Amino acid sequence: MDVMSSSLQQQRVVVEQLRREAAIDRQTISESCAKMMKYITEHEQEDYLLTGFTSQKVNPFREKSSCTVL
């Protein structure tokens, strides 16, 4: 009997998870792509991969200078 109640409890958890997933608001791919394209064009001036860095000092990926003490 204990195995049966355990299985029933597991099934209830699964059903609740499926209900939560079914309640999620879905969007079509065309809507999502349009929103993404709009966001990208609005923020392209802030994208360092497109515009580059204004100077090497603000570039966090520049090679670090090393100090060697003899």
Curated annotation (Swiss-Prot):
Gene Ontology cellular-component terms listed: heterotrimeric G-protein complex
Tissue: Predominantly expressed in the central nervous system.
GO MF terms held by the record: G-protein beta-subunit binding
Keywords, sorted A to Z: Cell membrane, Lipoprotein, Membrane, Methylation, Prenylation, Transducer
Membrane topology type: Lipid-anchor
Chief location: membrane
Ranges in a coiled coil: none
Keyword Membrane: yes
Positions of the pro-segment in this chain: 68-70
CDD domains reported for this sequence: GGL
InterPro entries in alphabetical order: G-protein_gamma-like_dom, GGL_sf, Gprotein-gamma
Taxonomy, superkingdom: Eukaryota
GO biological processes: apical protein localization; asymmetric neuroblast division; cell adhesion involved in heart morphogenesis; convergent extension involved in gastrulation; dorsal closure; embryonic heart tube development; establishment or maintenance of cytoskeleton polarity involved in gastrulation; G protein-coupled receptor signaling pathway
Lipid-modified sites (S-geranylgeranyl cysteine): C67
Compartmental location: Cell membrane
Residue positions, PTM Cysteine methyl ester: C67
Family to which the UniProt record says this protein belongs: Belongs to the G protein gamma family.
Oligomeric form and interacting partners: G proteins are composed of 3 units, alpha, beta and gamma.
Function, in words: Guanine nucleotide-binding proteins (G proteins) are involved as a modulator or transducer in various transmembrane signaling systems. The beta and gamma chains are required for the GTPase activity, for replacement of GDP by GTP, and for G protein-effector interaction.
Protein name stated in the entry: Guanine nucleotide-binding protein subunit gamma-1
